[in-house]
């Protein structure tokens, strides 16, 4: 989860987020190596008085600085495309949850259960209990089973929203009249926080998302108590 003064990514809790974290490190290393090379070349040019004023053409150099960037782009593109296809895959979900964005709250419907739906509003700061997080707590959490593929159908009732949970590697736009989908899967139990990530009006900052991932038997008990 997130913590104060955090500079890096949140701890990965899903296979997709683990892949995204590895890809981030992979790309950042390439950027670091390129930046180091450019800095070395600039430093060398400034430190020497030697120049090549008579050089009119250097085909070998032109070949190198054409092919090398192309190879680097391929090394970035291939893992990126792999992750994009992984994020679009939804294989045999055990549960489907429909998520609707509103100004300024979320509503959830468990389509596999009859009459299991609720709205999720942010808990005002004055009503928070000790230890709860400001602007991130909700009155109704989304309870889901861990270690199982879950399909989220995401749309909006009014304006553009975006349903995002960083530690699970999720960010899907909620568009009026359009149904987007995403796969939710967690490697471990716990509370995972997110927020609306698309400017949607004056209370955009007050649309938190809380997923409570629990073992399957606890989810079955919860769903039975809600119906």
Curated annotation (Swiss-Prot):
Record field: transmembrane: 15-45, 60-87
Keywords: Copper, Electron transport, Magnesium, Membrane, Metal-binding, Mitochondrion, Mitochondrion inner membrane, Respiratory chain, Translocase, Transmembrane, Transmembrane helix, Transport
EC class name: translocase
Disulfide bonds: none
Residues in the Mitochondrial matrix compartment per record: 46-59
Topology, Mitochondrial intermembrane side: 1-14, 88-227
Catalysed reactions, as listed in the record: 4 Fe(II)-[cytochrome c] + O2 + 8 H(+)(in) = 4 Fe(III)-[cytochrome c] + 2 H2O + 4 H(+)(out)
Stored SUPFAM superfamilies: Cupredoxins (SSF49503), Cytochrome c oxidase subunit II-like, transmembrane region (SSF81464)
EC assignment: 7.1.1.9
Gene3D superfamilies, A to Z: 1.10.287.90, Cupredoxins - blue copper proteins (2.60.40.420)
Free-text function comment from the UniProt entry: Component of the cytochrome c oxidase, the last enzyme in the mitochondrial electron transport chain which drives oxidative phosphorylation. The respiratory chain contains 3 multisubunit complexes succinate dehydrogenase (complex II, CII), ubiquinol-cytochrome c oxidoreductase (cytochrome b-c1 complex, complex III, CIII) and cytochrome c oxidase (complex IV, CIV), that cooperate to transfer electrons derived from NADH and succinate to molecular oxygen, creating an electrochemical gradient over the inner membrane that drives transmembrane transport and the ATP synthase.
Homology family: Belongs to the cytochrome c oxidase subunit 2 family.
Assembly notes: Component of the cytochrome c oxidase (complex IV, CIV), a multisubunit enzyme composed of 14 subunits. The complex is composed of a catalytic core of 3 subunits MT-CO1, MT-CO2 and MT-CO3, encoded in the mitochondrial DNA, and 11 supernumerary subunits COX4I, COX5A, COX5B, COX6A, COX6B, COX6C, COX7A, COX7B, COX7C, COX8 and NDUFA4, which are encoded in the nuclear genome.
Protein name as annotated: Cytochrome c oxidase subunit 2
Organism annotation: Acomys wilsoni
Designated gene of the protein: MT-CO2
């Amino acid at each position: 989860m997130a913590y104060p003064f955090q500079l890096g990514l949140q701890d990965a809790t899903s296979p997709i987020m683990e892949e995204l974290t590895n890809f981030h490190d992979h790309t950042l290393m390439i950027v670091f190596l390129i930046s180091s090379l450019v800095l070395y070349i600039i430093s060398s040019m400034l430190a020497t008085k030697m120049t090549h004023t008579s050089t009119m053409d250097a085909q070998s150099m032109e070949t190198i600085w054409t092919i090398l960037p192309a190879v680097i782009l391929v090394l970035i593109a291939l893992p990126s495309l792999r992750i994009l296809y992984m994020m679009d895959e939804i294989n045999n979900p055990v549960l489907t949850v429909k998520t609707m964005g509103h100004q300024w709250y979320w509503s959830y419907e468990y389509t596999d259960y009859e009459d299991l739906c609720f709205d999720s509003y942010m808990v005002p700061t004055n009503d928070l209990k000790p230890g709860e997080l400001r602007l991130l707590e909700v009155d109704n959490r989304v309870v889901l089973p861990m270690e199982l593929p879950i399909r989220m159908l995401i749309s909006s009732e009014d304006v553009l929203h975006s349903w995002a949970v960083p530690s699970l590697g999720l960010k899907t736009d909620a568009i009026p009249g359009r149904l987007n989908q995403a796969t939710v899967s967690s490697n471990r139990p716990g509370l995972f926080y997110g927020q609306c990530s698309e400017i949607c009006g004056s209370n955009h900052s007050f649309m938190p998302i809380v997923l409570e991932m629990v073992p399957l038997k606890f989810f079955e008990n919860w769903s039975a108590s809600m119906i």
